[in-house]
């Protein structure tokens, strides 16, 4: 019997706050370029080039759909393969939906699912690929394989896997190096983590899994039939919408929320662990990002326009301004267009407290950056004051803004580069570089980029209310545009 095809299932729905102010609710860390020229999501997908995989499935939520689609398009991985969760229900249901879809896509086969987080770093990519190849026959045998990271130090922020006896070798193979799992352990205290470190039989839980789609669904049906039944219904009613696989919100919101660890892994007798050293990090804090980054002779990590004098072991990031640091040590400084973080490295775990304060004060800095992505391009809110807002808008070639109007504001557009095709009422006009056009309050208008280069323009809005919800669409260019 030939081996089943491998389908990577990439979980990209998180909204983490531990890397604020770079990571925001609408632009979390999986979409950031933290190590190299690609984002963590893109790197996760490109890492699979060392394996023989079918096109991957990426699971995300409604809010992130356009960012995910654009990042997949940039690396030529966009192919109707983004599953949109209408509401978050943790990993067990998300993986179940993926398993049903994989079986539907491969009706004559029982594909292997390789479950990955979109926001992890794996430095030793060839070792990772070798580990997956070694696990393939084990998973084809019907085992549920999890990959345990050989710990480098006593870490209290990770869950652990306690190994048992060596698993039964495959026919024709010597010891495969896979162990049965005794138990999964939640994040330990410091004393317990030290014991795990010295025991030699505990591994960090990486959240990387490999199993047959049918095996996962069988175990889920055995231990959590309530989740299985809802996901079966949801998967059967899913439908394709452009690059997205959409699920029924009415059905999916009835699904219990549960992690794969609690729903299946802690209960199944089919689980084996493969210990690996793949240079893994979940990049869960500014400290861990400093740990894995390339450093200067003084131990500094500097990203952006940075000047330093007499500094040591700092992480300094600048998005849009010159940052100068003098005489500091073991600090984190992160500058974005609308926020600056300054912290001791030893205190960065308290970043979540700042995010909680922003939420209580109903500020927007925890939700989004100044720069916001849309299916047609992006905009950057440059300035705002009483009765006015200034944006820089970039429209991709061939894309445009749907026919719309505003009740509370008028707009002036000044084209910086490219060509704008503007429909205002019953008239259409081309507006080119150094030209402008006025959109009166209450007027119906649309904007297109008919050219082959990006359209850059400045928008100045003025009126009593300037919120993004004062957009009355009369004809949608993109389904579910915002």
Swiss-Prot record:
Catalysed reactions, semicolon-separated: alpha-D-mannose 1-phosphate + GTP + H(+) = GDP-alpha-D-mannose + diphosphate
EC numbers: 2.7.7.13
Keyword tags: GTP-binding, Lipopolysaccharide biosynthesis, Nucleotide-binding, Nucleotidyltransferase, Transferase
Disulfide cross-links: none
Signal sequence residues: none
Listed pathway(s): Nucleotide-sugar biosynthesis; GDP-alpha-D-mannose biosynthesis; GDP-alpha-D-mannose from alpha-D-mannose 1-phosphate (GTP route): step 1/1
One GO molecular-function entry: mannose-1-phosphate guanylyltransferase (GTP) activity
InterPro entries according to UniProt: GMPP_N, Man1P_GuaTrfase/Man6P_Isoase, Man6P_isomerase-2_C, ManC/GMP-like_b-helix, Mannose-6P_isomerase_type2, NTP_transferase_dom, Nucleotide-diphossugar_trans, RmlC-like_jellyroll
Enzyme class: transferase
Family that this chain belongs to: Belongs to the mannose-6-phosphate isomerase type 2 family.
Function: Involved in GDP-mannose biosynthesis which serves as the activated sugar nucleotide precursor for mannose residues in cell surface polysaccharides. This enzyme participates in synthesis of the LPS O antigen.
Protein name: Mannose-1-phosphate guanylyltransferase 2
UniProt organism field: Escherichia coli O157:H7
Gene: manC2
